[in-house]
Amino acid sequence: MHYARIILTLTLAFLALADPWPAAAEEEFVTALTGKFPPFSYYDNQGNLAGFDVDVSREIALRINRESRIIATEWDGILAGLLAEKYDAIIGSMAITPARQESVDFSTPYYHSGAQLFVHRDNPDKVYSISECNGLRIAVVLGETYQHFLEEKFPDVEVVTLKSAAEIFAMLEQKRITGFVTDRLVGAWQVKEAGRPFVPVGEMLYKERIGIPVRKDNPDLLGQINTALAAMEDDGTMQRIHQRYFGLGKTSSSKLGTMEPSVIATKLLKGFAVSLGIALAALLLGFVLAIPSGLLLTFQRGSLKPLHFLVRGFVDFIRGTPVLIQLLFVWLGLGLSPFPAAILTLGICAMAYMAEVIRAGLMSVDPGQDLGARALGLSPLDRFRFVVWPQAFRIAIPPLMNCVVALLKDTALVSIISIPELIREAQSIISVTFEPGLYYLIAGLMFFAVTFPLMKLSDRVERSIKAKGFAHD
């Protein structure tokens, strides 16, 4: 129990110190975007956020006398984060739609664009408009309005949803899709800067007004944003920002497709350190909770029976529901910041699986071992500590190590709540370099470099326990 207290203390300390999203100070203007939508938001060759939306966000913060803080998060969860009060506004090229206006209020539009179909220059399917794409695969980024438009207006088109433009570009280069639909300005800019053989075809599918959503309970902030946008239009600031990224013959000073090797290495290593930190904290929390949970799953007599059924129901629920849903529930439903939400979710998930492993280990010990220890006059605690637990633990080591490996891999899920772990950092690099195969491979090898030794370590620990006489064949 002494070690358990130490482990739990370290876990709670990690929870307190590791949160990258401190509560917003009143003087801060906290905005969200994806960081994967160049030229509106992306990481430059030094690894810093840049782009049209980034500049607009900082300019608005300056004009409303607040300090700008920009959070990069996943697009498919960005509105949920706003409604959960994780940030003040979204300045991420969000189109104003009636469905979105039901849950948030939008500023006046700060630019106009439209949806455009792009295909490979070779155009093997010979399509020149979206109406000719029936039965063909057209890609969009998950969560964008183009997906709903195509599904509603062109139900015979097979809509393929992917996480980023880089993944779409890779699919189209391999000709696994016919084309993709995206913002006309964004698509043209990305294709040019990434040097891909894609061309727009047909007319714009529809026009879009792009605004800044805020929560409906924050009309004062909405008024300040609208005032700032109007002033930026009047004094030419908005036009200058637009020229910086879209002016004739102009490109961003941080050209897309390039990122310093040292910056790439730093981002990957920092992201992996975050992944390992989350995994370690969740493992410690999960193991501390798994031991008593495993005992309660094993013993169901007398006064322990109600607790047994309570723990059994909880463990079955955790094991029977997707980790991603649990993560979103803890983050949005409980209102926790990303790091505590990730550690708590993965820790409880690990507890559920490790508790079952411990239960199986305890039940595999020959009952005669406990009877023999009882005949020698050992107390129940001593029988457990010196006879039952060493044998059960040895049996449980290989599956427990599998739980550790699975937990480390599950950290890849936490990118959806804006934690800059390894996969999120790899995606930010891919959004600039458009080389998904290379950087996903590197990320996979980094995980393997840790998980493979862990699998071998389990064999060594098992042999060590046997050699010290804690267990036998």
Task: Identify the role of each PLM range.
Residues 30, 66-67, 84-92, 136-137, ...:
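Alpha-to-beta junction loops
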Residues 37, 54-55, 69-80, 125, ...:
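Short helix-initiation/N-cap motifs at beta->coil->alpha
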Residues 54-64, 121-124, 131, 136-137, ...:
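Extended ligand-binding regions for polar small-molecule ligands
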